[in-house]
Regions:
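N-terminal module of bacterial RNA polymerase sigma factors
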Residues: 2-60
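Sigma70-family region 2
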Residues: 43-44, 80-98, 117-119
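Structural recognition of an alpha-helix C-terminal capping motif at a helix-to-coil junction
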Residues: 63, 77-84, 97-109
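Hydrophobic side chains within well-formed alpha-helices
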Residues: 38, 49-50, 78-81, 99, ...
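ATP/adenylate-binding site constellation spanning eukaryotic-like Ser/Thr protein kinases
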Residues: 55-59, 80, 108, 117
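Short, intrinsically disordered, charge-balanced linker/junction segments flanking boundaries
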Residues: 126-131
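Short, charged helix-capping/linker segments at alpha-helix termini
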Residues: 43-52, 62-81
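Arg/Lys-rich amphipathic alpha helix in sigma70-family domain 2
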Residues: 91-94, 105-125
C-alpha cells in the first residue's frame, strides 16, 4: 500500500499529517473529555464545548468527506458549513449523547448531496454537448 495517492489532493495528506501531529496540549485536553461530557459541557460553557468539538472532529470530518467526494475543497466547505449551522441553529441543544455519530451522519448526507448535484451537473453538460 502506498502512502500517496495521486487521485486525492495533497491538502488531504496535509490534514492527515496535522491530525496525527497536532499540538500535544490540544490532544491532551480533548482526550480527557468524553463525548458525553462534551455534550453536557454545551449546557454550561457553549464556546469552550464548541471549540473542543471543532478541534476534535474538524480534521477527521474533512478526511471522511474527502473519502466520499474525492474533492478536498468541497469537503472543507461541507465540514465548515456543518460547524456553522451547528452553532448558528444551536443544534447542540438537540443532541443527548452521540455527538460523533451525529457529526459523521451530517457530513455523509451533505457529501452525498454534493455528489448527486455534481453528477446532475455533469449529465446536463453531456446533454448540452450532444445538442
Amino acid at each position: 500500500m502506498t502512502f500517496y495517492n495521486k487521485n486525492i489532493n495533497k491538502k488531504y495528506y496535509i490534514l492527515r499529517f496535522l491530525y496525527y501531529f497536532a499540538p500535544r496540549n490540544t490532544i491532551i485536553e480533548m482526550n480527557h473529555i468524553t463525548d458525553k461530557e462534551l455534550v453536557s459541557l454545551f449546557s454550561t460553557d457553549k464556546e469552550k464545548a464548541f471549540n473542543l468539538f471543532f478541534q476534535r472532529y474538524y480534521i477527521r470530518l474533512c478526511m471522511y468527506a474527502v473519502q466520499i467526494t474525492d474533492d478536498f475543497s468541497e469537503s472543507e466547505d461541507i465540514v465548515q458549513s456543518f460547524f456553522v449551522s451547528f452553532w448558528e441553529k444551536k443544534l447542540y441543544k438537540t443532541i443527548t449523547d452521540n455527538l460523533k455519530g451525529y457529526a459523521y451522519l451530517c457530513i455523509r448526507n451533505a457529501s452525498l448531496k454534493f455528489i448527486e448535484k455534481r453528477e446532475k451537473i455533469n449529465s446536463n453538460d453531456i446533454l448540452l454537448n450532444e445538442e
